[in-house]
Protein backbone atom coordinates (compact mmCIF):
# COMPACT_ATOMS: atom_id res chain seq x y z
CA UNK A 1 0.00 0.00 0.00
CA UNK A 2 2.84 2.36 0.92
CA UNK A 3 4.56 1.60 -2.41
CA UNK A 4 1.38 2.36 -4.35
CA UNK A 5 0.89 5.63 -2.43
CA UNK A 6 4.51 6.63 -3.03
CA UNK A 7 4.15 5.90 -6.73
CA UNK A 8 0.98 7.98 -6.95
CA UNK A 9 2.64 10.88 -5.14
CA UNK A 10 5.61 10.65 -7.52
CA UNK A 11 3.32 10.70 -10.57
CA UNK A 12 1.40 13.66 -9.10
CA UNK A 13 4.65 15.55 -8.50
CA UNK A 14 5.77 14.89 -12.08
CA UNK A 15 2.44 16.16 -13.43
CA UNK A 16 2.69 19.32 -11.33
CA UNK A 17 6.19 19.89 -12.62
CA UNK A 18 5.11 19.40 -16.24
CA UNK A 19 2.15 21.76 -15.81
CA UNK A 20 3.98 24.25 -13.60
CA UNK A 21 2.75 27.86 -13.62
CA UNK A 22 5.16 30.31 -15.26
CA UNK A 23 6.05 33.27 -13.06
CA UNK A 24 5.77 36.51 -15.02
CA UNK A 25 7.44 39.72 -13.95
CA UNK A 26 7.64 43.19 -15.51
CA UNK A 27 10.87 44.93 -14.57
CA UNK A 28 12.68 47.95 -16.03
CA UNK A 29 10.47 47.96 -19.13
CA UNK A 30 10.90 44.24 -19.88
CA UNK A 31 8.43 41.35 -19.42
CA UNK A 32 9.99 38.15 -18.06
CA UNK A 33 8.67 34.61 -17.76
CA UNK A 34 10.62 32.53 -15.24
CA UNK A 35 13.50 34.96 -15.66
CA UNK A 36 13.53 34.83 -19.48
CA UNK A 37 12.35 37.54 -21.88
CA UNK A 38 8.72 36.72 -22.66
CA UNK A 39 6.81 36.84 -25.96
CA UNK A 40 3.03 36.88 -26.34
CA UNK A 41 -0.12 38.81 -25.51
CA UNK A 42 -0.54 39.75 -21.86
CA UNK A 43 -3.12 41.30 -19.59
CA UNK A 44 -2.04 43.09 -16.42
CA UNK A 45 -2.80 45.96 -14.08
CA UNK A 46 -0.82 49.20 -14.48
CA UNK A 47 -1.59 50.99 -11.25
CA UNK A 48 -5.39 50.66 -10.95
CA UNK A 49 -6.13 50.17 -14.66
CA UNK A 50 -6.29 47.01 -16.80
CA UNK A 51 -3.93 46.84 -19.81
CA UNK A 52 -3.72 44.41 -22.71
CA UNK A 53 -0.84 44.28 -25.18
CA UNK A 54 1.81 42.27 -26.99
CA UNK A 55 5.44 41.71 -26.02
CA UNK A 56 8.21 40.40 -28.28
CA UNK A 57 11.40 39.24 -26.61
CA UNK A 58 10.35 41.04 -23.47
CA UNK A 59 9.62 44.50 -24.88
CA UNK A 60 6.27 46.05 -25.88
CA UNK A 61 5.55 45.75 -29.61
CA UNK A 62 2.25 46.61 -31.30
CA UNK A 63 -0.99 48.01 -29.90
CA UNK A 64 -1.56 48.33 -26.15
CA UNK A 65 -4.99 49.19 -24.77
CA UNK A 66 -5.66 50.54 -21.29
CA UNK A 67 -9.22 50.53 -19.94
CA UNK A 68 -11.41 52.50 -17.59
CA UNK A 69 -12.96 50.41 -14.77
CA UNK A 70 -16.19 50.16 -16.81
CA UNK A 71 -14.29 48.57 -19.72
CA UNK A 72 -14.23 51.56 -22.06
CA UNK A 73 -10.98 52.41 -23.81
CA UNK A 74 -8.87 54.96 -21.91
CA UNK A 75 -5.54 54.84 -23.77
CA UNK A 76 -4.24 53.29 -26.99
CA UNK A 77 -0.44 53.08 -27.24
CA UNK A 78 1.48 51.95 -30.30
CA UNK A 79 4.92 50.47 -29.62
CA UNK A 80 7.68 49.53 -32.05
CA UNK A 81 10.41 47.39 -30.50
CA UNK A 82 9.84 48.92 -27.07
CA UNK A 83 9.46 52.52 -28.22
CA UNK A 84 6.12 54.30 -27.80
CA UNK A 85 5.55 55.92 -31.21
CA UNK A 86 1.95 57.09 -30.76
CA UNK A 87 -0.51 57.56 -27.92
CA UNK A 88 -4.25 58.25 -28.01
CA UNK A 89 -6.22 59.16 -24.89
CA UNK A 90 -10.00 58.99 -24.56
CA UNK A 91 -12.68 60.41 -22.30
CA UNK A 92 -15.11 58.02 -20.62
CA UNK A 93 -17.75 58.98 -23.20
CA UNK A 94 -15.47 57.67 -25.99
CA UNK A 95 -14.49 61.11 -27.27
CA UNK A 96 -10.82 61.51 -28.18
CA UNK A 97 -8.96 63.50 -25.50
CA UNK A 98 -5.55 63.80 -27.13
CA UNK A 99 -2.96 62.38 -29.50
CA UNK A 100 0.81 62.31 -29.18
CA UNK A 101 3.22 61.11 -31.85
CA UNK A 102 6.92 60.28 -31.79
CA UNK A 103 7.65 63.41 -33.85
CA UNK A 104 6.26 65.30 -30.81
CA UNK A 105 3.10 66.55 -32.53
CA UNK A 106 0.34 67.13 -29.99
CA UNK A 107 -3.43 67.61 -30.06
CA UNK A 108 -5.68 68.00 -27.02
CA UNK A 109 -9.49 68.09 -27.07
CA UNK A 110 -12.34 68.79 -24.68
CA UNK A 111 -14.98 66.10 -24.22
CA UNK A 112 -17.24 67.85 -26.74
CA UNK A 113 -14.63 67.35 -29.49
CA UNK A 114 -13.41 70.96 -29.63
CA UNK A 115 -9.68 71.54 -29.70
CA UNK A 116 -7.86 72.84 -26.63
CA UNK A 117 -4.33 72.98 -27.98
CA UNK A 118 -2.21 71.84 -30.91
CA UNK A 119 1.54 71.74 -31.46
CA UNK A 120 3.23 70.99 -34.78
CA UNK A 121 6.82 69.89 -34.29
CA UNK A 122 7.75 70.37 -37.97
CA UNK A 123 6.64 74.01 -38.14
CA UNK A 124 7.11 74.86 -34.46
CA UNK A 125 3.58 76.30 -34.40
CA UNK A 126 1.49 76.12 -31.25
CA UNK A 127 -2.19 77.12 -31.11
CA UNK A 128 -4.39 77.55 -28.04
CA UNK A 129 -8.13 77.69 -28.70
CA UNK A 130 -11.13 79.49 -27.24
CA UNK A 131 -14.13 77.55 -25.92
CA UNK A 132 -15.93 78.20 -29.23
CA UNK A 133 -13.08 76.66 -31.25
CA UNK A 134 -11.52 79.88 -32.55
CA UNK A 135 -7.77 80.46 -32.04
CA UNK A 136 -6.83 82.38 -28.90
CA UNK A 137 -3.06 82.46 -29.30
CA UNK A 138 -0.92 81.40 -32.25
CA UNK A 139 2.85 81.22 -31.85
CA UNK A 140 5.78 80.00 -33.92
CA UNK A 141 9.50 80.69 -34.17
CA UNK A 142 9.01 84.13 -35.73
CA UNK A 143 5.72 85.59 -34.53
CA UNK A 144 2.95 85.44 -31.95
CA UNK A 145 -0.61 86.75 -32.02
CA UNK A 146 -3.50 86.97 -29.55
CA UNK A 147 -7.18 86.98 -30.56
CA UNK A 148 -10.47 87.39 -28.75
CA UNK A 149 -13.28 84.86 -29.16
CA UNK A 150 -14.50 86.64 -32.31
CA UNK A 151 -11.14 86.24 -34.11
CA UNK A 152 -10.28 89.92 -33.61
CA UNK A 153 -6.53 90.38 -33.22
CA UNK A 154 -5.56 92.10 -29.97
CA UNK A 155 -1.78 91.85 -30.12
CA UNK A 156 0.94 90.72 -32.50
CA UNK A 157 4.71 90.52 -32.35
CA UNK A 158 7.12 89.62 -35.17
CA UNK A 159 10.81 88.96 -34.63
CA UNK A 160 10.49 90.23 -31.04
CA UNK A 161 8.97 93.55 -32.19
CA UNK A 162 5.37 94.66 -31.63
CA UNK A 163 3.30 95.09 -34.81
CA UNK A 164 0.89 98.00 -35.24
CA UNK A 165 -2.61 96.48 -35.48
CA UNK A 166 -4.52 99.72 -35.09
CA UNK A 167 -4.64 100.02 -31.30
CA UNK A 168 -4.13 103.23 -29.32
CA UNK A 169 -3.02 103.69 -25.71
CA UNK A 170 -5.21 105.87 -23.50
CA UNK A 171 -4.01 107.11 -20.10
CA UNK A 172 -6.60 107.34 -17.32
CA UNK A 173 -6.75 109.71 -14.34
CA UNK A 174 -5.46 107.08 -11.89
CA UNK A 175 -2.33 106.59 -14.00
CA UNK A 176 -3.39 103.29 -15.52
CA UNK A 177 -3.93 102.74 -19.25
CA UNK A 178 -6.48 101.31 -21.64
CA UNK A 179 -5.67 99.77 -25.00
CA UNK A 180 -8.36 100.78 -27.47
CA UNK A 181 -9.18 99.33 -30.89
CA UNK A 182 -12.13 100.42 -33.04
CA UNK A 183 -13.40 102.57 -30.14
CA UNK A 184 -13.52 99.59 -27.81
CA UNK A 185 -11.30 98.75 -24.83
CA UNK A 186 -9.43 95.51 -25.59
CA UNK A 187 -6.89 95.59 -22.74
CA UNK A 188 -6.11 97.30 -19.44
CA UNK A 189 -2.62 98.11 -18.12
CA UNK A 190 -1.67 99.15 -14.58
CA UNK A 191 0.15 102.42 -13.85
CA UNK A 192 3.53 100.66 -13.63
CA UNK A 193 3.07 98.91 -16.97
CA UNK A 194 3.67 95.54 -15.28
CA UNK A 195 0.21 93.99 -15.33
CA UNK A 196 -1.68 93.67 -18.64
CA UNK A 197 -5.22 92.29 -18.91
CA UNK A 198 -6.62 91.45 -22.35
CA UNK A 199 -10.40 91.27 -22.49
CA UNK A 200 -13.09 89.20 -24.14
CA UNK A 201 -15.39 91.14 -26.46
CA UNK A 202 -17.93 91.12 -23.61
CA UNK A 203 -15.49 92.61 -21.08
CA UNK A 204 -14.36 89.62 -19.00
CA UNK A 205 -10.64 89.09 -18.40
CA UNK A 206 -9.30 86.76 -21.08
CA UNK A 207 -5.55 86.92 -20.52
CA UNK A 208 -3.40 88.35 -17.74
CA UNK A 209 0.33 88.96 -18.16
CA UNK A 210 2.38 89.89 -15.09
CA UNK A 211 5.73 91.27 -16.22
CA UNK A 212 7.00 91.46 -12.61
CA UNK A 213 6.47 87.76 -11.81
CA UNK A 214 6.70 86.33 -15.33
CA UNK A 215 3.35 84.55 -14.89
CA UNK A 216 0.88 84.40 -17.78
CA UNK A 217 -2.68 83.27 -17.11
CA UNK A 218 -5.58 82.61 -19.51
CA UNK A 219 -9.19 82.55 -18.31
CA UNK A 220 -12.48 81.02 -19.35
CA UNK A 221 -15.41 83.40 -19.56
CA UNK A 222 -16.68 81.96 -16.26
CA UNK A 223 -13.53 83.27 -14.54
CA UNK A 224 -11.81 79.92 -14.01
CA UNK A 225 -8.18 79.61 -15.07
CA UNK A 226 -7.87 78.02 -18.51
CA UNK A 227 -4.08 77.96 -18.75
CA UNK A 228 -1.22 79.16 -16.57
CA UNK A 229 2.44 79.54 -17.51
CA UNK A 230 4.97 80.03 -14.72
CA UNK A 231 8.54 79.53 -15.86
CA UNK A 232 8.91 75.95 -17.12
CA UNK A 233 5.60 74.90 -15.61
CA UNK A 234 2.43 74.95 -17.71
CA UNK A 235 -1.06 73.89 -16.67
CA UNK A 236 -4.17 73.47 -18.85
CA UNK A 237 -7.49 73.09 -17.04
CA UNK A 238 -10.97 71.80 -17.67
CA UNK A 239 -13.73 74.40 -17.65
CA UNK A 240 -14.44 73.65 -13.97
CA UNK A 241 -10.84 74.52 -13.07
CA UNK A 242 -9.54 70.97 -12.57
CA UNK A 243 -6.22 70.16 -14.30
CA UNK A 244 -6.29 68.47 -17.71
CA UNK A 245 -2.62 68.69 -18.70
CA UNK A 246 0.46 69.62 -16.67
CA UNK A 247 3.98 70.09 -17.99
CA UNK A 248 7.00 70.81 -15.82
CA UNK A 249 10.18 70.90 -17.87
CA UNK A 250 10.30 67.64 -19.84
CA UNK A 251 7.80 65.78 -17.65
CA UNK A 252 4.04 65.86 -18.24
CA UNK A 253 0.83 64.47 -16.79
CA UNK A 254 -2.72 64.14 -18.11
CA UNK A 255 -5.81 63.87 -15.91
CA UNK A 256 -9.36 62.68 -16.43
CA UNK A 257 -12.38 64.78 -15.47
CA UNK A 258 -12.34 63.41 -11.91
CA UNK A 259 -8.79 64.67 -11.38
CA UNK A 260 -7.15 61.24 -11.61
CA UNK A 261 -3.85 60.90 -13.47
CA UNK A 262 -4.41 58.59 -16.45
CA UNK A 263 -1.34 58.92 -18.67
CA UNK A 264 1.85 57.47 -17.27
CA UNK A 265 4.39 54.74 -17.90
CA UNK A 266 3.78 51.21 -16.61
CA UNK A 267 5.13 52.21 -13.20
CA UNK A 268 3.47 49.52 -11.07
CA UNK A 269 2.52 46.32 -12.91
CA UNK A 270 0.58 43.56 -11.13
CA UNK A 271 -1.79 40.67 -11.91
CA UNK A 272 0.14 39.62 -15.02
CA UNK A 273 -1.57 36.97 -17.14
CA UNK A 274 -0.57 35.59 -20.55
CA UNK A 275 -3.63 35.28 -22.79
CA UNK A 276 -2.06 34.23 -26.10
Where are these regions (language model features)?
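Bacterial N-terminal signal peptides
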Residues: 8-15
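Positively charged n-region of N-terminal signal peptides that target proteins for export
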Residues: 1-4
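Glycine/tyrosine- and acidic-biased, solvent-exposed loop/turn segments at the edges of beta-strands
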Residues: 17-276
Amino acid sequence: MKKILSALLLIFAILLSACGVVKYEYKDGVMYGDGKEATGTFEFKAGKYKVKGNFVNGVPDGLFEEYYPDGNIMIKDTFVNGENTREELYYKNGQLMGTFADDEDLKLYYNDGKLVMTYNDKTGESIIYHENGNPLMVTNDKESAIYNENKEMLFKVENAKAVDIGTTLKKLEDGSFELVKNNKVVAKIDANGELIKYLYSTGETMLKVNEATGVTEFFFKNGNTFMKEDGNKNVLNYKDGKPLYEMDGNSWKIYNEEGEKIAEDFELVTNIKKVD
